């Protein structure tokens, strides 16, 4: 049994209650850690464990509360995005950031499942879903300026906001029974609210790909950027490989900055050299319906995008949740309630497609 203990003072840690038949080796393997780490954290002298014994699986993590947080281990140096070109370099190696991100995600996942009602329906049980938060790492995506209600200039960084939406989608999908993974992960935060919304997320370059082996290289070049987009597909393909036939999906989440496109979401399906991926287009059509609003109609388009090519998921799409070129949409995405609203719409699109596949 995995437990999550968290409070602003105590920090955050993951614990495991030993069951009959468990060994230190099996516990370490299951939770992607090492026997040495577990022994050190719990001050164990031998490898013997006993049923009912509670072991700490992760070091205690310092939690930093902030208007645009919380953050874990370390928080941004700036309280908000200072200007269009502002960014903060990683303070740790890709390997360490990967390990920290994994600890956070395991804690997040355990917390979701611990709070889930036992009798809740799980219509997505048996599905494997890949969420691909756009950009991240070295690549911030779009950075646009916006004005608050008090005419104060603030800046919106695409990758930081779509990662927050991806985490909100992740949570809802897990509650519905799906197995879910992220292609890109952050080492110092989970879901974040903005209170007030003018405390915009800072462009931190610390995100990494969700791939332990890939992050062993001691180079900042392994962090997400336009030159290694194919790594997203590799992470996705590894996850969906064991899925049941027709029970895997890939959803890439973005917020584009396109002057020539009207307001509202855009769903992109895979189209290459005039040939349309029918399953991708079918999924896109269902998602477009889910995202549609009378004042901001959703659109649909076929394109040959790197994250959709050679993708082994049953159906793959890219969703531009907002077009932040428009001041109104850049204004909206700063609010966590808007991000939660769009996360639920994305989930409703996934659910609708899953029901269609029955």
Q: Can you describe what each PLM-predicted range is?
A:
Residues 1, 5-6, 10-19, 23-46, ...:
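Catalytic-site microenvironment of enzymes
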């Amino acid at each position: 049994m995995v437990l999550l203990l968290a409070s602003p003072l105590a920090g955050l840690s993951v614990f495991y209650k030993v069951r009959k038949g468990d060994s230190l080796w099996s516990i370490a393997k299951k939770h992607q850690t090492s026997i040495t780490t577990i022994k050190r954290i719990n001050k164990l002298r031998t490898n013997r464990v006993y049923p009912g014994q509670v072991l700490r699986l992760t070091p205690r993590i310092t939690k930093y509360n902030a208007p645009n947080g919380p953050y874990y281990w370390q928080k941004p140096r700036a309280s908000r995005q200072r200007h269009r070109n502002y960014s903060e370099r990683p303070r740790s190696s890709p390997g360490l950031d990967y390990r920290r991100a994994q600890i956070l995600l395991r804690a997040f996942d355990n917390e979701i499942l611990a709070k889930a009602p036992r009798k809740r329906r799980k219509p997505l049980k048996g599905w494997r879903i890949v969420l691909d938060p756009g950009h991240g790492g070295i690549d911030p995506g779009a950075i646009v300026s916006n004005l608050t209600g008090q005419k104060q200039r603030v800046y919106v960084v695409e990758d930081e906001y779509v990662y927050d939406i991806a985490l909100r989608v992740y949570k809802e999908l897990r509650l519905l029974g799906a197995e879910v993974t992220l292609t890109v992960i952050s080492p110092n935060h989970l879901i974040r609210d903005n209170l007030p919304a003018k405390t915009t997320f800072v462009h931190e370059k610390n995100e990494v790909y969700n791939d332990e082996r890939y992050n062993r290289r001691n180079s900042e070049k392994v962090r997400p950027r336009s030159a290694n987009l194919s790594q997203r597909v590799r992470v996705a393909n590894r996850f969906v490989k064991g899925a049941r036939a027709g029970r895997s999906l890939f959803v890439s989440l973005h917020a584009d900055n396109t002057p020539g496109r009207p307001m509202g979401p855009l769903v992109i399906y895979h189209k290459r050299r005039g040939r349309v991926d029918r399953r991708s287009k079918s999924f896109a059509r269902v998602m477009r319906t889910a995202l549609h609003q009378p004042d901001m109609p959703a659109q649909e388009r076929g394109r040959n995008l790197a994250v959709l090519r050679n993708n082994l998921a049953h159906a793959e799409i890219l969703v531009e949740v907002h077009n932040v070129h428009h001041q109104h949409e850049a204004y909206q995405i700063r609010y966590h309630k808007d991000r939660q609203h769009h996360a639920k719409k994305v989930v409703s699109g996934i659910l609708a497609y899953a029901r269609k596949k029955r």
